[in-house]
Amino acid sequence: MNIPFRVGQGFDVHALVEGRPLIIGGVTIAHTHGLLGHSDADVLLHAVTDALLGGAGLGDIGRHFPDTDPAYRGADSRVLLRAAFDKVRAAGWAPVNVDATIHAQAPKIGPHAAAMVANIAADLALDAGAVNIKAKTNEGLGYLGRKEGIAANVVVLLARAG
């Protein structure tokens, strides 16, 4: 069966720690803590990358950019996203739209959302109107509410490239 569309879903979470920059959606945000990870720990772009790869049936971010590989230590997640985008296009798929939710008690994401949208749209060759970013607090509940981490959920619609 030749289905013209696929949906990819991505999720990522990273702990907040002192001494690291906070980078979300390719935007460096002034904050007391940053996200812990092997790369730049961009929770949003990691979830977008997973959604793209998963929708195309290409596995996940860890398969293509393993955290055991020193080549990816401190890696810019926009570079990883663009590499994943190239793999998805080579497999015959193109993103149609991206819908993302960032879960963070702090900092406020709203002032940075437009820049995040612009970065993702540029990296995926989409119009900015095809990328949506929402932000939610956890109402003080759980590890997110205690400001111990930040998470992101992403859904991507892919169409057969033609």
From Swiss-Prot:
* Record site: Transition state stabilizer: 38, 137
Catalytic reactions of this protein: 4-CDP-2-C-methyl-D-erythritol 2-phosphate = 2-C-methyl-D-erythritol 2,4-cyclic diphosphate + CMP
* InterPro entries in the record: MECDP_synthase, MECDP_synthase_CS, MECDP_synthase_sf
Instruction: Report the EC number(s), separated by commas if there are several.
Output: 4.6.1.12
Q: What class of enzyme is it?
A: lyase
Please state the pathway this protein functions in, per its UniProt record.
Isoprenoid biosynthesis; isopentenyl diphosphate biosynthesis via DXP pathway; isopentenyl diphosphate from 1-deoxy-D-xylulose 5-phosphate: step 4/6
Q: Which residues bind 4-CDP-2-C-methyl-D-erythritol 2-phosphate?
A: 12-14, 38-39, 60-62, 65-69, 146
Q: What function does this protein fulfil?
A: Involved in the biosynthesis of isopentenyl diphosphate (IPP) and dimethylallyl diphosphate (DMAPP), two major building blocks of isoprenoid compounds. Catalyzes the conversion of 4-diphosphocytidyl-2-C-methyl-D-erythritol 2-phosphate (CDP-ME2P) to 2-C-methyl-D-erythritol 2,4-cyclodiphosphate (ME-CPP) with a corresponding release of cytidine 5-monophosphate (CMP).
| Co-factor: note | Binds 1 divalent metal cation per subunit.
Q: Which family does it belong to?
A: Belongs to the IspF family.
**Superkingdom as given in the UniProt entry:** Bacteria
Q: Which HAMAP family match?
A: IspF
* GO biological process assignments: isopentenyl diphosphate biosynthetic process, methylerythritol 4-phosphate pathway; terpenoid biosynthetic process
What Gene3D superfamilies does this protein map onto? 2-C-methyl-D-erythritol 2,4-cyclodiphosphate synthase
Q: What species is this protein from?
A: Bordetella pertussis (strain Tohama I / ATCC BAA-589 / NCTC 13251)
- Annotated PANTHER family: 2-C-METHYL-D-ERYTHRITOL 2,4-CYCLODIPHOSPHATE SYNTHASE, CHLOROPLASTIC
Q: Subunit comment for this entry?
A: Homotrimer.
Matches recorded under NCBIfam families: ispF (TIGR00151)
Identify the cofactor(s): a divalent metal cation
Note the Pfam families from the entry.
YgbB
Lineage of source species = Bacteria, Pseudomonadati, Pseudomonadota, Betaproteobacteria, Burkholderiales
Name of this protein: 2-C-methyl-D-erythritol 2,4-cyclodiphosphate synthase
Q: Where does a divalent metal cation bind?
A: 12, 14, 46
